[in-house]
Each structure stands twice: as C-alpha cells, then as structure tokens.
Amino acid sequence: IPADNYPCATDYITQMKDMIQILLEKGKAYKHDDGSIYFKISSFQDYGKLSNIKTNNKKPNSRIISDEYDKNNVQDFVLWKAWKVDDGDIYWDSPWGKGRPGWHIECSAMSKATLGSHFDIHCGGVDNIFPHHENEIAQSKCANGKNFVNYWLHSEFLMLNDTKMSKSLGNYYTIQDLKKMNFSSESI
C-alpha cells in the first residue's frame, strides 16, 4: 500500500524553526553562546517514561561536548546546531544564526505538519525508543501542550546467525533471495 505522504525533512525547515521558537518562548529550550539551541530535559517531568529511564542519575549542570556542541546539562539534546566552517554550505538561516536542525526536531515538525499535533500510532525500531522517540515526545508535548501519540509500536531486529541483520554489515537477504531459498510468500 503506497503512503499518502513522503515527507522530506528539508521541506519542513520553517516548521522546525517555528517549533524551536515556541520551545524557547516557553522556557523549554535555551540558546548556547555558539548559537546552538538545546532542549532543557529538566523542564519536562515525564522525560524517560517511554524508555523507562531515570534522569536523576546524571550530574546536574555538568558540561560536556556532544556532537561537537557544548550544552549546559549532559542530558539536554540539540534542537538547532549552529553552523561551523566545516559544515560548508549545509545550513539554513534562522533567528539564531546559520545552522541546521537536530534529528529529533525534524520528525516532530514533519509529523505535526502532516498528521497534526496529536495522532494515534507512531512506529519505529527498538533502537529508536531512546533517545529519538523519547526526545520527540518531550519536544512535541512541550511545544504543542498536549499528548503527542496514543500508541507506540516498536519492532525488534531481524537476527541472522546471532547478529542483527543490517545493510551496513552486508548480512541481509532481499525478498528475491528468500524466494530463491524456497521460503513461502506467507512466511516472508
């Protein structure tokens, strides 16, 4: 069944910047000296519910360098990465300076634009539960002021010889490969 929409992240940069601005205005995010914008995890009391993690085991106000960007707290995550010379021409102008959106804000902005600020089912692999889906919940709920998703469905990895099947590892089979190995259509 073909999808109704095939969203491309770069088509939603304006919506991403708008969502970041809302989070800044609500005090859920902050701007670092270099122009990067971070989500303040401590501002969202339900953080960790999906993944069942506790955020109080990290040292508050510790400073680290993550993905080459400073932040005020080890738990905070990037919403907007300030441009650096090494980024070349990969940037967009924003009220905070040149930069690019973080991975998590891309998904929140695209889903809001295509599905609305609240929808029923969100799917992904188990490797997306933390931090990606946890961060999507935090920023979406804080920006929109309501529940983001009713049901989360996460698929497990396909295993092949006790190793995760992965294109990057080259240990995968296509449907055609499985048919040649006499697997039935029902089992595929």
What annotation goes with each model-predicted range?
Residues 14-188:
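Alpha-helical recognition segments enriched in aromatics with Gly/Pro capping
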